[in-house]
Amino acid sequence: MIQAAGIYLTETDKMNITAADFGLNQIKTEGVQILTLFDTDRMAAKILVLLPYQTEPEHWHPPVGNDPGKEEVIRGIWGDLTFYIPGEDNMKEGFIVEGKEKCYTMRHEIAIGPGDQLILPPGTKHWFQAGKRGAVMYSFSTKVTDLLDQFTDPNIIRETKIEE
């Protein structure tokens, strides 16, 4: 999908794409594919990919020490993408993952097309979902602290745990 969106990938890039299922074991429904372009002590850039109708679960980036939390700018590249943030419930395009009504509380819908941007201040609850074609987007942010993200769904595990 990334290459179909017109972004050149090196062989190393292809090897570095990761998939996050958040410990839910239903990646086609809830998850995201991630290519980290760079991640320094101050800023980061990623390409995020959602498969058709895939949803990244509701979360927010909390304060860490004296840092107010990750600030993020999303820029649509390709596909059908909808973000859900605080605000009036105007949800009509997307859907709540079956049985997860309490885990997706943000219902203010914003469609993000190619070239559209959305700025998410630190601590902003959000989730996003692809439509029938899937979606590709850039995520530009301040320092990445993703392992500290908070999720509305109590069953989410952000870090993979290996059981013996």
Write out the residue ranges for each language-model feature.
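A short, N-terminal "cap"/entry segment at the start of jelly-roll beta-barrel domains
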Residues: 1-47, 64, 98-102, 164
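Short beta-strand His + acidic residue motifs that chelate non-heme Fe in jelly-roll/DSBH
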Residues: 57-58, 66, 83-84, 110, ...
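Double-stranded beta-helix
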Residues: 88-105, 125-164
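Short, surface-exposed charged micro-motifs
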Residues: 47, 73, 127
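Glycine- and acidic-residue-biased ligand/ion/polar-headgroup-sensing regions
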Residues: 51-52, 69-91, 96-99
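Conserved short histidine dyad/triad with adjacent acidic residue
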Residues: 29, 47-68, 87-89, 111-114, ...
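Short, solvent-exposed loop/turn positions at domain surfaces
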Residues: 44, 70, 98, 106-107, ...
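Short, charged/polar surface micro-motifs in flexible loops or helix N-caps
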Residues: 41-43, 52-56, 80
